């Protein structure tokens, strides 16, 4: 956790927490290999929105384990298909995320795959989400995945009036804000609690996103929540 996150959880002033960490020898990030990277930032909400996908293993019956007679045993749920073959039911889910470069306002959905049609549907709903905060997506930055290189995705961006940019090949750090948001999301939501099922984990996502956007203070934007930088009051054109 960062000093800002500790201060928020404990209800203490950030300066107080920072002072305590410094006295304990945790004041210099360089000693821990956590130097703050040099970051850029777009000048207004919507000028650039980062989009990415994170693959997560499905959770079924306690994440693939079960208890019987007080003993934990491996559990591999299967079913028989129409041809009489045994199939495993546990697979993957795909968390599609969008984060605004200027405000850090974020949107995410858990979806079944990362195909072009799915990515287009996500983009359409993400655009609707940002418009509720007075933000129009001008440019979109993604990696070079097949969904984002498809003709249908290009046509969708054109129809929505969005300029599509892609990262340099083999340089995922170009989309660094998306990568950092995914790490935060995994720590705070996906791995931040014990879930009995994928459905329970998915159900918890909206609440975590609301906290991230409305309450969680972000050091890169003056220790304010992302919503504080949105266009609800018409500050940007």
Annotate each predicted stretch with a short phrase:
Residues 1-70, 146, 154-156, 168-172, ...:
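Basic, flexible linker segments flanking DNA-binding modules
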Residues 100-102, 112-116, 145:
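A short acidic/small-residue loop/turn micro-motif
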Residues 105-109, 165-167, 191:
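Short small-residue beta-strand/loop micro-motif enriched in glycine and branched aliphatics
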């Amino acid at each position: 956790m960062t000093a800002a996150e500790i201060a928020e959880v404990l209800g203490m002033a950030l300066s107080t927490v920072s002072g305590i960490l410094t006295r304990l020898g945790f004041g210099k990030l360089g000693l821990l290999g956590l130097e703050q990277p040099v970051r850029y930032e777009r000048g207004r909400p919507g000028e650039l929105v980062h989009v990415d996908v994170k693959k997560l293993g499905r959770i079924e019956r306690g994440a693939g384990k079960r208890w019987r007679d007080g003993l934990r045993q491996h559990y591999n749920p299967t079913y028989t298909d129409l041809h009489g073959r045994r199939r495993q039911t546990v697979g993957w889910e795909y968390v599609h995320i969008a984060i605004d470069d200027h405000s850090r306002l974020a949107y995410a959905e858990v979806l079944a795959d990362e195909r072009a049609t799915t990515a287009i549907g996500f983009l359409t709903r993400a655009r609707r989400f940002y418009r509720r905060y007075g933000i129009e997506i001008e440019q979109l930055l993604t990696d070079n995945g097949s969904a984002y290189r498809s003709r249908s995705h290009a046509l969708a961006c054109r129809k929505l009036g969005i300029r599509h940019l892609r990262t340099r090949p083999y340089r995922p750090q170009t989309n660094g804000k998306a990568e950092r948001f995914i790490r935060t999301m995994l720590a705070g939501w996906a791995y931040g609690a014990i879930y009995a099922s994928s459905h329970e984990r998915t159900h918890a996502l909206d609440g975590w996103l609301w906290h991230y956007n409305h309450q969680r203070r972000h050091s890169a934007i003056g220790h304010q929540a992302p919503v504080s930088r949105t266009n609800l009051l018409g500050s940007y054109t």
